[in-house]
């Protein structure tokens, strides 16, 4: 979707749908103040939608990220691209042109204002909706999608407040519709190989994980009227916490069976000073430029520690400001050894091809030969050709479509999206209370204790 400018950001999406609590309210509400409400439907853990011969897709938002999804869907079998919506005509024209060039029927187009997406939702020939819009629109649009009888697939993060998380859970349970936050990193080749290794016991009993989103993005501040920086920059002036936790946390959560035998219990968080963006603005923009009038409050480095009910620990970091190489950490430690990413390396006590666990084994090929994930073995070449963050985007969308067409449960559900996203809010709450711990809501309402762990998913 056309990146909503500052006036929309400051208005907040609460004006979009009456009764929805959104980005600019309840930012500091304690998680415990939103206790589990009585379930109005039934749990959607393991929800299986009726098989779809064809998956008919609508897209809300076809800008930078949304257009990438359009490109990937054009390479998938068993899908129809029925309609697109955006408030920016140029990105609509680009998406339509691309779809037609791929010898697919021209999609219907909805535009004109911020609520035009509701016209798309009124169609009866759409099964799923891909939502790729600025963050404050994710929850309202996903709720409206499920209320319209369609499955919602939402870009990260899923929600921006604890109340939004509960509204998404309640709506999914009442409508019995999927609401999947599309955490693409869970489908990376390394992440899925490690999931395979974890399930086969290579690392022993899991103890500790480390996750991060360390990605220098100051350059986005130069995106003034369009693109991600035109709205994402302002979040650094509104919140102080982990703004974007899910890329690193998603894979660690699946390794540890979070919401499927374990769950997040509580969190504590700290942030460094917020210096880098003001320094960058001073260096890169005129003194009277709007970027130099902003007060950047989000600490350059946010570090949170999560304790699970089973006693495991997870470190989660966020830094999109300082000059340093990209990393998601992706470290998982067990009683028999450890995997760490960026760069990939392994050390195990038993089963390490003769390598001592006192030294990192950085020769990954033999590990791929033995533990490469079935999904990557099957469609890895297609994924590499079609791209999308090294192929993980293609694998994610392929797997989504496969599950919908074959009557299988999705790999991520609304509870996962809520638990991973709520770190954003809880990290801020902890920081504002001298880093004291904050409890995680149990969005599953106790169902996590008996949920079947995610297996080595395949096809």
From Swiss-Prot:
It holds the Pfam family GFO_IDH_MocA. Predicted to be exported by the Tat system. The position of the signal peptide cleavage has not been experimentally proven. It is an enzyme of class 3 (hydrolase). Binds 1 NAD(+) per subunit. The NAD(+) cannot dissociate. Disulfide bonds: none annotated. Substrate binds at residues 213, 232, 244-247, 326. Transmembrane segments: none annotated. Its cofactor is NAD(+). Its EC number is 3.2.1.-. Keywords: Glycosidase, Hydrolase, NAD, Signal. Residues 1-31 form the signal peptide. It comes from the Bacteria. NAD(+) binds at residues 64-65, 86, 135-138, 155-156, 184, 244. The keyword ATP-binding does not apply. Belongs to the Gfo/Idh/MocA family. Glycosyl hydrolase 109 subfamily. PANTHER family: BCDNA.GH03377 (PTHR43818), GLYCOSYL HYDROLASE FAMILY 109 PROTEIN (PTHR43818:SF1). Glycosidase. This is Glycosyl hydrolase family 109 protein 1.
